[in-house]
Amino acid sequence: MIITTGNEVAGYEIVEYLGIVRGIVVRATGIRRGLVGGLKSIAGGNIEEFTHVCETARIEASNRMLAHAKQIGANAIIGMRYDSTEFSQGSTEVLAYGTAVRLSK
């Protein structure tokens, strides 16, 4: 499966557009990570506890998007993007989305 943020894939022709595919995940930091991350935020800089939650959510959302694309018979996803929104205090929604296509050489 080819996944790109671009709208075309060099060396391939798009033979069919299958529609939008997406994967969505809502993740909470959890009490321990939330407390440690909250304390670290006072000092500033990168907060590894929150970074871990965000990266895990992106991977999970990507995997769900990929499964959706395979389910509808795509062999590529173009225009792939991530979006995230704070869902509630301590919870974040991560959305991975793109256009599922069939490519041919």
Predicted segments, located by residue:
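Short, solvent-exposed loop/turn elements at beta->coil junctions and helix N-caps
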Residues: 6-9, 82-86
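Short glycine-biased active-site loop of nucleotidyltransferases that positions the nucleotide triphosphate
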Residues: 87-91
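Short, well-ordered alpha-helical segments
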Residues: 21, 26, 34-81
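N-terminal presequence-like segments and the immediate start of the first folded domain
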Residues: 1-33, 71, 75, 92-105
